[in-house]
């Protein structure tokens, strides 16, 4: 049951803007009380921008559960990944940005003005990105990359998992839509092909070690696709479960073999060609216009004007503070000799904190996660006044995706609740996880991290549910780890506490390594060694991590920048309110205000302070 504090009434009205037609989850938020012409005009503007967004991102409509009614045709479509398609998106972004910038927000309530400000910020960042000479630019999301197809980017990774996990099959029409999307998938692959060929013509070639990893994955994907693979298995299994008669498997197999596999082969051939001229230079400094791309990517990730030098120095300072805390705890549990990194490496070899190998260990990991999720759910009333109950599930990443994937990731489900929030865990080897680090990872990806935070957006305007800012999303997830600690997750577990601190220090390392690679000409090996030597991180994990920084420049910097800013705002609110400060009310402010850039987050905290003072 929702029980909002009166002090948050102004911020809670973020949830009062009406959902777009077709957003099915019932809201328990109070009805809107603002009915001025300016408010109505703002709602109309936000609705229209949201509809424009979905026209170019039909997958999002399905994932949110709003591909019904007037939007039903979107269920049969995939986004256009060709150069022409990207140009159309860029043109729409520029048009909608001008409308948002021209809108007079002076007469709006705080929540409605915030929504317009969020659109302005997200669309300005995207417009600036589209002005760059290359790259895969997102609108209000976290995955911006110079490389359209690489080890962790591309339709060959996104679409098979998406079709199996998010595309519903409840009736024959859904199965037909699935087949239509299979055909669109082949077109997506060729659209991407044209873009990576054009990028090569501009001198943009990914690092050789990324191409090698991508080619390994793509060859396996093409091999599986020629015989049908998961694309066929998914529709066969689900139509059978729903007793939907038809030759679905045979039709899917024909599309896979005749259209998708050849398109994959064409991408493979292009990357093989690029591999011949590729070097091991890891950073954007070695690419044409790379410094410009990195400056933009860093701004998009952090929503600040911090320079690479600023970010690098911040990471080094944060590491000193975190390692001082770790040093004290490590000494208390018998690890007194050597640097913090050396002691954490020794701790990782301690068999008491390891999971078993193979399937036995995988089962242990899933049981461990289940235990921690149950515990944290029970603690939520101690952290929030406004309660939600996320529908979530834990799933193993598809094995073919695991080599190029991080240890885990998570996100909220659909508006109507039919698609649960998912916590995807990489189980290619149990050595990726330890008993002192997995709880913290779980709190980050699921509850009270990404999955819980996403649940609070479900009554916001649709465009607000589509737009996200990396510094907020990941800053919140790190803050969620901190909340779990403050709620007692490690009260009787000092080794778990040091694992939590190591995870936060890991994000501080990212500030140093990401900027080191892209602005200070570090090699891939330097990045890996920094994590291992300084923080005692798992070499197997950080090799993939550093590869990720090479393909997603700047993205890794949003985590700690966002987390530190949230804590700065928390201390500001505490100082301003004194005895009136309530951490649960502050936490409500963060989640009810929605996903915002950091300057807007500060405005939301201003509003909370004003309301709490009365």
For each of these PLM feature ranges, what is it?
Residues 6-25:
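N-terminal export signals
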Residues 24-614:
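N-terminal maturation segment of proteins
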